[in-house]
Amino acid sequence: MRGADVMQEELFTIGGLDQYVPVDHPLRRVREVFNDCLARMDNHFEALYSAFGRESIPPEKLLRALMLQVLFGIRSERQLIEQLRYNMLYRWFVGVPLHEQPWDHSTVSKNRERLLEGGTPEVLFEQVLDG
């Protein structure tokens, strides 16, 4: 008997994005090193953000997304967000679970400007060299 060509969504997703990324994938090591650098930048990030108001995109996630943009030659933030919508490898690297929608590209632009004005690229570069 021929099976039907239908796609049934699961009610619950078991496991996380990590299970879809091969153990030997090169981005695993990149993410590990990058996360170590970002962890050492916590005081820098705290100084850039107010304790009040709406939560913004976590700077660590934004920087991981921008790292993907550079590594894979993604030409615009609009394309970056499009990739984050359906690319599980990118979602895993950035830390965006399947049940969350990626941010709007204009929000990414505004938050990127905050990081640039706050000297984040220089601090990140220092952390990479010190790593």
Locate predicted features:
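Charged, often Cys/His-bearing segments associated with DNA-binding zinc-finger transcription factors
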Residues: 1-36
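Short acidic (Asp/Glu) and glycine-rich catalytic loops that position anionic groups and cofactors
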Residues: 8-13, 41-45, 105-108
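Basic, short loop/linker segments at the boundary and entry of helix-turn-helix/winged-helix-like folds
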Residues: 23-67, 72-73
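Short, conserved catalytic/metal-binding motifs centered on acidic residues
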Residues: 25, 63-65, 80, 104-108
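Short amphipathic alpha-helical surface patches that mediate protein-protein
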Residues: 35, 85-86, 129-130
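Short, charged, surface-exposed loops that flank catalytic or proteolytic processing sites
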Residues: 76-77, 120
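DNA-recognition alpha helix
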Residues: 79-91
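Active-site- or DNA-interface-adjacent structural scaffold in DNA-acting proteins
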Residues: 90, 96-131
